[in-house]
Swiss-Prot record:
Belongs to the short-chain dehydrogenases/reductases (SDR) family. NAD(+) binds at residues 82-111. The active site is at Y232 (proton acceptor). GO terms for biological process: glucocorticoid metabolic process. This is 11-beta-hydroxysteroid dehydrogenase type 2.
Amino acid sequence: MERWPWPSGGAWLLVAARALIQLLRADLRLGRPLLAALALLAALDWLCQSLLPPSAALAVLAAAGWIALSRLARPQRLPVATRAVLITGCDSGFGKETAKKLDAMGFTVLATVLEMNGPGALELRACCSPRLKLLQMDLTKPADISRALEFTKAHTTSTGLWGLVNNAGHNDVVADVELSPVATFRNCMEVNFFGALELTKGLLPLLHHSRGRIVTLGSPAGEMPYPCLAAYGTSKAAMALLMDAFSCELLPWGVKVSVIQPGCFKTESVSNVSHWEQRKQLLLANLPGELRQAYGEDYIEHLHREFLHSLRLALPDLSPVVDAITDALLAARPRPRYYPGRGLGLMYFIHYYLPEGLRRRFLQSFFIIPCLPRALRPGQPGATPAPDTAQDNPNPNPDPSLVGAR
């Protein structure tokens, strides 16, 4: 097929014009991403000239160049000025690190903690400016939430409240739904959903006035059925849906809502081995005899060891999550969802596009590889035949002496 040079030249002229405008505005990221984009555009140019008529080639090349330069634009950030932000759960992890970064940027930070004299609160007092204010708050106590609302109003009379970061979260069991006490589900919902809901609703008048931001820490466990995290995951799923509702309803008020869905990061609470050991012992101590007989203590020990093994993959650098929270607060056009962390793109692709059996096996291999409960193992007294489960289970008859080994 004869090649037409004019669509190529016209498209490249449009791309060059936009690139020049972005350069003059200091709104174009230079370096390898730009070189890669130009190489891909050159390859697309050759394909378009070979396969498409002139008008279609011009349209495709111009659109591709426009999209590429849009992706390479520097994110437009709002000035910090005198903005104030309330962050919950600043005793450790994402909340503490976000409070430190926003304080260093010049924000007025209102940070809630469970313990005013705990290590996290002491660290924030030592390394942050006097602008940072600490408040003790337990999201399961309505009186604490009411006090936090009054505290926030009192400390933002001159600046207004620009943002709320719903970071505080709770999970204290890693076990099958049948083994998890109903109280665990209630506790997760109280902190991760109802407490955050009450606080958010109470702050909406201030956020209406500032046309500010709501940023909420979610979890992929709220979108994918992670093994043994049902109590935590259901509360995070409820919170994510609530934020989607807020996003639609608050749009006329100019309030923007973002949900951060982080991967596996090594926060203090997640990597606290002694805490998880205590929770396992408490679960075993309160397990009804019938369930203890059906599942076996070695089954729970296996889940515990698998969970601790999965934590070895946790990322120690929390900055991707902190950066995502910062962008959601200051970007001119914040994203509705942020996915900081390694491998999340692959996980979501598998979850949404591959068959259910493959999805389940992938999550198990990534997080907790299950074994059969005692009552389903061949050779056990009163064992229940389970041909379907045995066929799907990668480890149907584990040797108790090797439970948790890899």
